[in-house]
Curated annotation (Swiss-Prot):
Keywords: Chloroplast, Membrane, Photosynthesis, Plastid, Thylakoid, Transmembrane, Transmembrane helix
Protein name per the record: Photosystem I assembly protein Ycf4
Gene Ontology biological process terms in this record: photosynthesis
N-terminal signal peptide: none
Primary location class: plastid
Compartments, record wording: Plastid, Chloroplast thylakoid membrane
Organism of origin: Eucalyptus globulus subsp. globulus
GO cellular component, one term: chloroplast thylakoid membrane
Keyword Membrane appears in the UniProt entry: yes
Family: Belongs to the Ycf4 family.
Bilayer topology annotation: Multi-pass membrane protein
This protein's encoding gene: ycf4
Domain of life (superkingdom): Eukaryota
Length: 184
C-alpha cells in the first residue's frame, strides 16, 4: 500500500504478518504437537491420541525420534509466532521531495537494534536499480543506489513481482525521485 502526493511518497511494508506465515506457523505447531503427543504416548504406553494405538509405536527408536522432531518443530513454530507478533520486517519507505530526504524504517527483532532507521539525502541517490535473476528460482529486486552507501533494497526478495510490476514500480519511483533506472 502506498500514499502519494505531489511532494511525498510513503510506501508501507507488510513484514512478517502475512497469511502464508500464519498458515505455516499454525500447521507447524499442530504437526509438531502431534509428533510430541505420539512420542509421549509411546513412552507412557497410554493412548494420548486415539488415531494411533501406542502399542504399535515402540519408544526406542520411533518414539524418541518423533519426540525430537516434535520438540524441534515446536521451537521453530514459536520462532515463527514471535516474528509474527513482533511484526519483523514491517515499516515504511518515505520519499520527501520538499525536504529532499528519503527515510527507510523497518522493525527488527527485540534488542538494541529493534528500530532500523535509515535516512538519506535525495541528491545522494544515484539511481534506481532492478536486479533480475531468471531460472528455477527467479527473483526480481528493486534497489536504490546511494553514493558511498551502496545499494539499499526496496522490495523483499520473496515478493515475486512480475516483470511488468517491478518495471512500473521502478519507473514511477525513478520519475518521482528524478533519477535514472539501471537493470542488472
Amino acid at each position: 500500500m502506498s500514499c502519494r502526493s505531489e511532494h511525498i511518497w510513503i510506501e508501507l511494508i507488510v513484514g512478517s504478518r502475512k497469511i502464508s506465515n500464519f498458515c505455516w506457523a499454525f500447521i507447524l505447531f499442530l504437526g509438531s504437537l502431534g509428533f510430541v503427543l505420539v512420542g509421549s504416548s509411546s513412552y507412557l504406553g497410554k493412548n494420548l491420541i486415539s488415531l494411533v494405538p501406542s502399542q504399535q509405536i515402540l519408544f526406542f527408536p520411533q518414539g524418541i525420534v518423533m519426540s525430537f522432531y516434535g520438540i524441534a518443530g515446536l521451537f521453530i513454530s514459536s520462532y515463527l509466532w514471535c516474528t509474527i507478533s513482533w511484526n519483523v520486517g514491517s515499516g515504511y519507505d518515505r520519499f520527501d521531495r520538499k525536504e529532499g530526504i528519503v527515510c527507510i524504517f523497518r522493525w527488527g527483532f527485540p534488542g538494541k537494534n529493534r528500530r532500523i532507521f535509515l535516512r538519506f539525502r535525495m541528491k545522494d541517490i544515484q539511481s534506481i536499480r532492478i536486479e533480475v535473476k531468471e531460472g528455477i528460482s527467479a527473483r526480481r529486486v528493486l534497489y536504490m543506489e546511494i553514493k558511498g552507501q551502496g545499494a539499499v533494497p526496496l522490495t523483499r526478495t520473496d515478493e515475486n513481482l512480475t516483470p511488468r510490476e517491478i518495471e512500473q514500480k521502478a519507473a514511477e519511483l525513478a520519475y518521482f525521485l528524478r533519477v535514472p533506472i539501471e537493470v542488472f
